[in-house]
Design a protein with these regions (language model features):
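Long, contiguous bundles of hydrophobic transmembrane helices that form the permeation core
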Residues: 2-13, 38-42, 46-47, 203-314, ...
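Alpha-helical transmembrane segments and their helix-start/interface "positive-inside/aromatic belt" motifs
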Residues: 4-20, 156-168, 261-264, 316-325, ...
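Core transmembrane alpha-helical segments of multi-pass membrane transporters/permeases
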Residues: 12-21, 48-104, 112, 284-347
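Hydrophobic core segments of alpha-helical transmembrane domains in multi-pass membrane transport
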Residues: 13-29, 86-94, 130-134, 176, ...
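Hydrophobic alpha-helical transmembrane segments of multi-pass integral membrane proteins
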Residues: 87, 116-150, 329-339, 355-395, ...
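Membrane-interface alpha-helices at helix entry/exit sites of multi-pass transporters
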Residues: 116-125, 160-168, 200-204, 362, ...
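Alpha-helical transmembrane segments and, especially, the helix-loop junctions at the ends
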Residues: 131-148, 156-205, 216-221, 373-388, ...
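Interfacial loop-to-transmembrane junctions
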Residues: 318-322, 430-451
Length: 471
């Protein structure tokens, strides 16, 4: 009996453009309207925030069909920084691959773990705690992209797959970001806009961060152990076979490596140290990070004595490998551009606020969580989402009988869905440099996402029952 062919999802770029078409169609029927906005300075930065109670309908703004083509172009403009950052990462790591330094370093690590097999089991939990702390303290997001390119070969050398290599830095920081206790871009901004003490409620948030981090670590470790026993169970088995730098621990041999390779690795690690310092102490963002890695690539190529033309060839080849993801990022941005140009984003916000006010107070926070999750599909910046929604949600929470602290928690926890969003520049940037198809990653991540959503909904119950306020 012939098996029925499995349903195959269309290319991710096709899925994104179908979403663009769907949102455009909705923009034709959703009434146009907007809230008034005012400038508010917080933590040294001035932002436009919505003013509650000021929503007003305006004359319907109909976008012509040409916006189906204009919006993705605007998406490139809107996402130019992160798109350029991803091009830089692709090109620089192609040069680093040519030097052979990363492959040699992984070989040495594999030898270490072959001689110390007990230490292998500590790699995932220790590193994920570090990245979760980074997400919880300073809101690590885009900064996780270069680490993916380092941890994939490490994971392969340990007998795992590239999904584990992505999960260590990306899921680690993403879980920390959503269950953050000190993240200035979500907790800090949202509390400031809600007029509650900055970083209040720290103790309960710290408990949630610990539990969420443990959930993610256990999930990744169980999966990693399964792959170690049978690599063919990996959804990216064929993709990983084409990667040239995997050295299984069991077959690792202590090989000699040259001075140039040692120097290149030294430059890379010094660069990562400078990256961490720049982010924490100097407030570096994508421009500075891109410049740093461009410098790392150029210096590494010179040390390895790669001719300039050959270096340029490898850079272009690496940048070409991530072209697909830059197109997807532009498409994801196009969705928000259509909502803004049609002036319907505030209408959607007002409608969702109405839904929240209509449900019983016991599940109001859960409704806020789900609502923020929907908005998060279109707006991925925690700061931008806070500026849009918290001035509306905070006074709404007073009316429905829950505390503003609980409302802030519902807002931040909705970030647990970020790692699956095809409209997220960070998610698609990570998958692009990792060369993992979105559909394979999504299928793998869904079980963990469901667990994290259930955890988030449960986590909102004690604040509701105890009338959790600033502590």
């Amino acid at each position: 009996m012939q098996k029925k062919p499995r349903l195959k999802l269309p290319h991710t770029l096709v899925l994104i453009y179908l979403l663009v078409i769907a949102v455009y169609a909705l923009s034709l029927v959703i009434p146009s309207g907007q809230y008034q906005r005012a400038e508010k300075t917080f933590q040294g930065q001035t932002r436009l925030v919505t003013i509650p109670g000021t929503y007003g309908a305006i004359e319907k703004k109909l976008l012509g069909p040409q916006w189906l083509l204009i919006a993705p172009i605007r998406g490139f403009q809107d996402g130019a920084l992160i798109i350029f950052l991803i091009f830089i990462f692709g090109g620089v790591f192609s040069i680093l691959g040519k030097t052979g330094a990363i492959e040699s370093g992984i070989q040495r690590l594999a030898v270490f773990f072959s001689r110390n097999p007990r230490s292998k089991k500590f790699v995932i939990p220790i590193l994920m705690v570090v990245f979760s702390m980074a997400g919880g303290v300073y809101g690590m997001a885009e900064e996780s992209i270069p680490f993916v390119l380092i941890f994939i070969p490490l994971a392969l050398s340990l007998g795992y797959d590239s999904v584990v290599g992505v999960a260590i830095p990306f899921l680690g920081s993403a879980v920390g970001f959503s269950a953050a206790f000190f993240n200035p871009f979500t907790v800090g901004i949202a509390q400031g806009l809600s007029d509650i003490p900055l970083y209040s409620g720290l103790a309960y948030r710290l408990i949630l961060w610990v539990v969420a981090t443990i959930i993610a670590i256990v999930f990744v470790m169980l999966y990693a152990n399964k792959i170690a026993k049978d690599p063919k169970q990996s959804p990216v088995y064929e993709i990983d076979r084409s990667r040239g730098y995997a050295v299984p621990v069991e077959t690792a041999k202590d090989v000699a490596w040259g001075t140039a390779q040692k120097l290149v690795l030294l430059i890379l690690f010094l660069g990562i140290g400078l990256l961490i310092y720049g982010i924490l102490a100097e407030g570096w963002y994508m421009e500075e990070i891109a410049a740093l890695f461009l410098g790392i690539g150029l210096v590494s190529g010179i040390i390895a004595r790669i001719p300039p033309s050959e270096m340029a060839t490898h850079f272009v080849a690496g940048a070409k490998d991530v072209m697909n993801v830059t197109l997807i990022i532009a498409g994801g941005r196009a969705i928000l551009i259509i909502l803004k140009e049609a002036v319907v984003l505030d209408t959607v916000l007002r409608f969702t606020a109405g839904l929240i006010s209509a449900v019983p107070s016991l599940i109001t926070a859960h409704m806020m969580f789900l609502t923020q999750g929907v908005i998060n599909f279109f707006i991925h910046s925690g700061t931008a989402q806070a500026a849009l929604t918290m001035p509306i949600m905070a006074p709404l929470s007073d009316l429905v009988g829950i505390t503003r602290q609980t409302t802030v928690l519902a807002f931040q926890l909705c970030e647990v869905i970020n790692p699956i969003l095809p409209t997220s520049a960070v998610t698609m940037g990570v998958l692009g440099v990792a060369k993992i198809p979105w559909e394979k990653w999504a299928k793998w991540f869904v079980p963990l996402m469901v667990v994290l959503i259930i955890f988030s909904l449960i986590a909102l119950i004690p604040p509701i029952l105890t009338n959790w306020g600033p502590l």
